[in-house]
């Protein structure tokens, strides 16, 4: 019996224009009426998905910052966090500055995003993903709240090269992932949506075999691996497909709604 559904947001729950379709909204409402717990599993801040939580009538706890935080929807407070240590921050920033000195860096905390760069492509791209405005500071250092992750954006081919170079240089000390074609992100070692899902499921006393996870990106691999049933979107990155037991239609075709309907949850 499926008791918990974990849903990636961009590229999965939302359509290509970052909107929630009526069919998907109705399917999630139906699943909740059928006793299924719905948890979002996003790379974004909780504040960025609060309007979505309201539209879906979701409370409870949700996975944010690619698994670096569990956040309570009702209060906006962290339930659990896995931040980068001072040593990991120093290592990661040095590597990014060496390998991609032209790229702006976003420093994510539980409730804000900081950068030491002037207005740039980073601001524009994150705005398109409905993230809150970046807080521009003089420098990224220990005077800021501990970071849950670092994020970089840029040319897609350049990002792919950066991901591989960062993994080669510091991959034994931190987690490096390409979350969408737009982003490369750095988190503490062992941090993933899958680890956060395991923690959330334990808090809810739900066994992994009763979990369905749906996603489309490289950062959803661990999410699908942790669930009893992993479903890849029709628009999923090729790297995700070997980790899915099922596929559904793309996010332009109400893939989440169709998956929930086929499972008899909606």
Protein language model features and the residues they cover:
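Hydrophobic packing residues within well-ordered alpha-helices of enzyme cores
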Residues: 24, 49-53, 162, 166, ...
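Short active-site oxyanion
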Residues: 35-39, 58-60, 148-149, 209-211, ...
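Short, structured coil segments at secondary-structure junctions
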Residues: 56-58, 65-66, 74, 170-172, ...
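Conserved acidic, metal-coordinating active-site core of Asp-based
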Residues: 99-214, 218, 226
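Mg2+-dependent phosphoryl-transfer enzymes with acidic/Ser/Thr/Gly-rich catalytic loops
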Residues: 1-4, 20-21, 185-266
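Active-site residues of response regulator receiver
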Residues: 8
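Active-site phosphate-binding/coordination module
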Residues: 19-122
């Amino acid at each position: 019996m499926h008791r918990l559904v974990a849903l990636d947001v961009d590229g999965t729950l939302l359509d290509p224009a970052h909107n929630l379709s009526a069919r998907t909204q109705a399917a999630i409402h139906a699943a909740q009426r059928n006793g299924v717990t719905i948890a979002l599993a996003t790379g974004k801040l909780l504040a960025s998905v609060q309007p979505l939580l309201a539209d879906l009538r979701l409370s409870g706890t949700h996975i944010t910052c690619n698994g670096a935080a569990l956040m309570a929807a009702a209060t906006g407070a962290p339930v659990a966090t896995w931040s980068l240590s001072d040593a990991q921050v120093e290592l990661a920033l040095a590597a990014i500055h060496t390998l991609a000195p032209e790229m702006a860096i976003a420093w994510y905390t539980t409730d804000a995003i900081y950068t030491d760069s002037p207005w740039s492509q980073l601001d524009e791209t994150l705005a398109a993903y409905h993230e809150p405005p970046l807080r521009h500071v003089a420098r990224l250092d220990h005077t800021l709240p501990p970071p849950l992750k670092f994020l970089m954006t840029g040319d897609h081919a350049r990002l792919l090269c950066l991901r591989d170079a960062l993994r080669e240089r510091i991959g034994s000390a931190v987690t490096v992932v390409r979350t969408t074609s737009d982003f490369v992100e750095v988190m503490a070692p062992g941090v993933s949506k899958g680890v956060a899902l395991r923690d959330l499921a334990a808090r809810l006393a739900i066994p992994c075999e009763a979990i369905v996870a749906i996603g489309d990106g490289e950062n959803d691999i661990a999410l699908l691996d942790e669930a009893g049933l992993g479903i890849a979107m029709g628009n999923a990155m090729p790297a995700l497909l070997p980790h899915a037991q099922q596929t559904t239609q793309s996010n332009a075709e109400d893939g989440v709604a169709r998956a929930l309907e086929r499972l008899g949850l909606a």
